[in-house]
């Protein structure tokens, strides 16, 4: 067994963090920026159609906006709402929103402005419902990838392998559903809260724009600007939650492997925060690990990570036996991650929760 120095471990685990960071960046581009951009286009289309239908000279007065829908318009509106309800039931959108839609469908009188607000909120409910589902899947994948890649890097570094327990779907779902911030809110709670805030702001802006008689261009620009803020907020959430669960997976893996201490490893460049610069190179007991205090994420968009810390050869030699054969197994220098996973994970049983 080779005894690696701290620089080796820091380099390897910094590379792991960079790989996870790249995955999160790609996720943000594919599932946040693109999805929000599509939602912006849909909102602009709804607003444009509404203005063109009821306005004169490309602007609508509050008096006109507060007029009730005609019998024909009301029927069309109810058909639209029924479609929303069906979509919500098929895609597990908030039950509270479905209840509001049913109430709207039963109303005898609906104003023009209310009809647009309901259409706008429907797009937000669908958007954020998808965000919750996609982020849940992403965080589960992040946790599993970090857990297995951590075990692989330790095995390669020590040149010995341990048979790993497989992480089943139920365990992964349970892990990412638990709150880790002091306020007790999960990523799902934060997304739905952000949706409520965004919906309130957009509807207030719409009402104020109508009161002022603003033209269509101003209204749609306000929507784009506010949605841009929402994109940034969602991206920060993805980045921070991903960093936490990647680190949590490493902590769990270190504990399983018998690693007693870890080193704080910062990505040192001109974007590194002062707090991460100060923490870089410090090592702590694994049992004392607290994200935000002595482990990543220390802040939003944190790019720091942890690496195993071995004080001597005795520490480095811990937990290097195959769980099935109780024998130490050597990891070939050229063993790839897929080969390692096939041998030491895929053939293993599902471990205890």
Give names to the regions the model predicted.
Residues 101-224:
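Structured, charged N-terminal subsegments at the starts of enzyme catalytic cores
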Residues 1-142, 225-226, 232, 236-353:
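Activation/maturation switch segments at domain boundaries
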């Amino acid at each position: 067994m080779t005894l690696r120095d701290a620089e080796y471990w820091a380099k390897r685990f910094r590379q792991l963090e960079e790989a996870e960071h790249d995955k999160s960046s790609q996720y943000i581009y594919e599932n946040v920026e693109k999805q929000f951009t599509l939602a912006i286009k849909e909102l602009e289309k709804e607003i444009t159609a509404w203005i063109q239908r009821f306005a004169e000279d490309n602007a609508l007065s509050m008096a006109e906006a507060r007029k009730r829908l005609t019998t024909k318009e009301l029927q069309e509106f109810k058909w639209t709402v029924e479609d929303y309800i069906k979509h919500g039931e098929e895609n597990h959108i908030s039950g509270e929103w479905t209840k509001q839609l049913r109430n709207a469908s039963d109303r005898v009188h609906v104003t023009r402005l209310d009809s647009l607000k309901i259409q706008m909120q429907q797009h937000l409910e669908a958007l954020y419902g998808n965000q919750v589902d996609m982020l849940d899947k992403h965080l589960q994948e992040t946790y599993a990838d970090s857990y297995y890649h951590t075990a692989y890097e330790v095995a390669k570094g020590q040149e010995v392998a341990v048979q790993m327990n497989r992480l089943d779907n139920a365990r992964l779902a349970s892990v990412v559903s638990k709150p880790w911030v002091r306020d007790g809110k999960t990523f799902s709670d934060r997304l739905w809260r952000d949706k409520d805030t965004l919906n309130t702001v957009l509807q207030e802006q719409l009402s104020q724009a109508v009161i002022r008689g603003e033209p269509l261009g101003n209204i749609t620009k306000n929507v784009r600007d506010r949605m841009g803020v929402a994109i940034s907020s969602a991206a920060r959430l993805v980045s921070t939650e991903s960093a936490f669960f990647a680190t949590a997976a490493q902590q769990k893996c270190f504990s399983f492997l018998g690693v007693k201490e870890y080193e704080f490893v910062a990505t040192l460049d001109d974007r590194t925060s002062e707090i991460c610069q100060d923490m870089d190179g410090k090592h702590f007991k694994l049992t004392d690990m607290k994200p935000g205090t002595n482990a990543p994420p220390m802040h939003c968009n944190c790019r720091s990570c942890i690496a195993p810390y071995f004080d001597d050869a005795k520490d480095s030699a811990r937990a290097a036996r195959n769980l099935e054969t109780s024998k130490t197994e050597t990891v070939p220098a050229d063993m790839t991650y897929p080969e390692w996973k096939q041998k030491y994970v895929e053939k293993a049983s599902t471990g205890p929760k």
